[in-house]
């Protein structure tokens, strides 16, 4: 009876707390003249297909989030406190609750500017964004109404690129461009294209070439609905002046060095197999990323840092610094159990690992487990289980040359063996 009484008392307490939470105002702690921002809404006039989520993140001030059916218990809890923040009880209640978001008109104006800028970035020029403020008691609901601006289709695309080998390589890459005549013009599209193109040029040997060398001109005077596009590649970045201009040139790899902790015993041949960067090769950003991925995949190093240092002579040196991780360790686990028949069980487990057992990134895993069950009042009822497992993993495909595996992933050959002994009242068996 006592257990039932405690249960009903607990349920009554929870029900009372929930009722108080629902009934408590969410604006009780607001000062005179303050309002709680209850909601934001975005609507696009005349275009139901536009995804409003594209601009919702650009609203500066967000209302309190709701957890259950438009209810936030932590917001209600915060409003249980009094207005005097110096009282200990009020400070405690506020520390576990959530303060109401106080509506700020200046944030609405800033949000309108933010949304307008982002719409222009998406290619909607001359958009109109307005706000409608609805006040209900001490709460404010803000609606942002958007009339989308004009969009232009891309007409002819022309290029202005420095002459020489760079121009040949650049124009050869335009077959893979993501900006084509007939597409909608937007800064978003052009930005993505410059990132793609800059990456492609770095793969062709142009170390240090970035999207900041690009600029664009759009001509909308000759047609009301289309824009002629001029893509320019300069020899100085957007933040520089012409006197800083330098010809774009291909780089060759110079010295390639690999360093790691001196106390780590390791076969350098394994590292050379993992590294796809070689002195005299043309610089290729893909190979840098591949080397980083392959060295990280060894799981021997907590840090892999690839540093590229250009020289004035068109050569870039590569310094690879490896920070070792913990090479070996133990994991111990012990579990206990009982069941309805009165059996008591103890299950110990021990695992040992070594990441560099033969000094070539070979992983060794050893596991030992047991499961012992018995009855406390009847020692004749018992069962025992013991198991051991061993695994060895090599960072190569045994029997095949490493030269045929050139991608970022590292092939592995795994050898596993296990033994399990079970002694139960019904049977005794060994499993390998």
Feature annotation, model-predicted:
Residues 21-23:
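C-terminal motif of bacterial Sec signal peptides marking the signal peptidase cleavage site
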Residues 2-11:
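Bacterial N-terminal signal peptides that target proteins for export
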Residues 169, 284-432:
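Gram-negative/organellar outer-membrane beta-barrel architecture
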Residues 10-13, 267:
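N-terminal alpha-helical segment
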Residues 3, 25-338, 369, 374:
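Periplasmic polypeptide-binding modules associated with outer-membrane biogenesis and secretion
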């Amino acid at each position: 009876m006592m257990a039932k009484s405690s249960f009903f008392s607990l349920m009554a307490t929870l029900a009372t707390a929930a009722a108080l939470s629902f009934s408590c105002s969410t604006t009780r702690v607001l000062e005179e003249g303050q309002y709680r921002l209850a909601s934001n809404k975005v609507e696009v006039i005349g275009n139901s297909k536009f995804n409003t989520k594209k601009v919702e993140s650009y609203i500066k001030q967000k209302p309190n989030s709701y957890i259950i059916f438009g209810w936030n218990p932590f917001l209600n809890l915060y409003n249980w406190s009094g207005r005097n923040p110096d009282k200990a009880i009020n400070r405690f209640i506020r520390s576990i609750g959530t303060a109401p978001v106080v509506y700020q008109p200046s944030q609405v104006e800033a949000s309108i500017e933010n949304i307008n800028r982002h719409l222009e970035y998406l290619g909607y020029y001359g958009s109109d964004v307005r706000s409608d403020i609805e006040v209900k008691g001490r709460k404010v609901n803000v609606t942002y109404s958007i009339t989308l601006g004009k969009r232009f289709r891309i007409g002819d695309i022309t290029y202005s690129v420095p002459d020489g080998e760079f121009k040949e390589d650049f124009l050869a890459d335009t077959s893979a461009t993501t900006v084509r005549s007939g597409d909608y013009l937007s800064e978003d599209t052009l930005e993505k294209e410059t990132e793609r193109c800059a990456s492609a040029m770095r793969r062709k040997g142009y170390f240090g070439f970035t999207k900041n060398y690009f600029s664009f001109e759009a001509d909308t005077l000759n047609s009301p609905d289309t824009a002629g596009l001029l893509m320019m590649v300069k020899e100085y970045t957007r933040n520089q002046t012409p006197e800083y201009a330098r010809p774009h040139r291909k780089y060759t790899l110079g010295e390639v060095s690999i360093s790691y902790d001196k106390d780590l015993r390791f076969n350098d041949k394994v590292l050379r197999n993992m590294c796809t960067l070689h002195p005299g090769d043309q610089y290729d950003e893909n190979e840098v990323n591949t080397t980083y991925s392959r060295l990280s995949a060894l799981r021997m190093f907590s840090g892999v840092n690839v540093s590229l240092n250009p020289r004035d002579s068109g050569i870039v040196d590569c310094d690879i610094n490896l920070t070792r991780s913990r090479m070996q360790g133990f994991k111990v686990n012990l579990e206990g159990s009982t069941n309805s028949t009165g059996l008591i069980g103890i299950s110990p487990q021990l695992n040992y690992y070594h990441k560099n057992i033969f000094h070539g990134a070979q992983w060794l895993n050893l596991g030992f487990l047991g499961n012992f069950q018995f009855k406390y009042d009847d020692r004749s009822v018992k069962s025992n289980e013991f198991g051991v497992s061993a695994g060895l993993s090599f960072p190569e495909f045994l029997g095949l040359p490493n030269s045929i595996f050139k991608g970022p992933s590292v092939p592995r050959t795994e050898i596993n063996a296990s033994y399990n002994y079970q002694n139960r009242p019904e049977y005794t068996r060994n499993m390998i």
